[in-house]
Amino acid sequence: MQCWIRQTINFFRKTKNTEKLTALLQQKEDILAVEMPVSLVYNGISHAVMMCSPNNLEDFALGFSITEGIIDKPEDIYGIDVVEVCNGIEVQIELSSRKFMALKEHRRNLTGRTGCGICGTEQLNQVYKTFPKLDCTFQFDLNLLDSCLIDLQKNQLLGCKTGATHACAFFDLYGNMLAIYEDVGRHVALDKLLGWHAKSGKPRGFILASSRASYEMVQKTVACGVEMLVTISAATDLAVTMAEKHNLTLIGFAREGKGNIYSGHQRLHN
C-alpha cells in the first residue's frame, strides 16, 4: 500500500513590493504521508490499534510482539497476514498456543496516540519493565558516526517527500547501514526495525534514530538486546535512567563531529 498521496492545498507566501510585505494565498500540490489505523489481532482477538504508515507491517508485527513481551523469538509466531478492511488494516498474527495463553493473562487495550505503546497501559507498574543487563560485546569507533548520519539523512525517502515521518536505521560496527524503516510514529519505525533485526539473526551493531530518545525507545532497544542507541534529538531523564540501569550505550543530539553520551561510554573509542 502506498505511504504517500498527492493533494492540492492552499498556502501563503509573503512577497515584497515597493511599499510593504504582502501575504498572497496560492495553490500548490503537496505530498502527504498516509497515516492509517492498524489493528494487531492475535489468534482472532484484537489486542492493539496503532496509527502507522501502511508498509512493512509484518516486520512491525514481529517487532511489536517482541518488544511488548508477547513472544521471545520469531518462531513463536506461526504466521502473519496483512488484510485491508474498510477502516484500516488488520494484521492477523497466529501465535503458538503457549504464547497466546500467556497473552490472554496480560491483555490490555492500546488504542490511542500515534505509535505510542505505553498509552493505554492499565497499571503504572506495567510501564517500568526490567530486563537482563546488556553485556558489553563490542567497541565502536566514533569517527564512523559522521558517515552514518549522512546515510540516515539521504535514505529517508518518505521523509524527504513528506517531511512527516521518523526513521530508524541499523548499522554494523563498520558503519555500514544494514536496514532503515520510516513511519509516522517513531515507536512504530523502531518496532519495524527491531522486527527486521530479530528475523535477521540479531546482527551486532547499533540503532540510529531521527527522533528523541524517550523511555520507550530505550526500553524497546534493550528488550531486543541491542547494545547502543543513537538519536538526533535529546534524551529524557527516564530514558537515561533506563539506559544506565541496563548498560545501554545512549547518545543524543548526534551531529557531525559531536554528540551527548548519556550512558555506556565504555563501548566507544576514537
UniProtKB/Swiss-Prot annotation:
Keyword Transcription regulation on entry: no
Active-site residues annotated for this sequence: C116
Subcellular location: Cytoplasm
One Gene Ontology CC term in the entry: cytoplasm
Record: residues binding Mo-bis(molybdopterin guanine dinucleotide): F253, A254, R255, E256, G257, K258
GO biological process, one term: Mo-molybdopterin cofactor biosynthetic process
Keywords: Cytoplasm, Molybdenum cofactor biosynthesis
GO molecular function: sulfur carrier activity; sulfurtransferase activity
InterPro entries: Cytidine_deaminase-like, FdhD
Protein family per UniProt: Belongs to the FdhD family.
UniProt name for this protein: Sulfur carrier protein FdhD
Provenance organism: Haemophilus influenzae (strain 86-028NP)
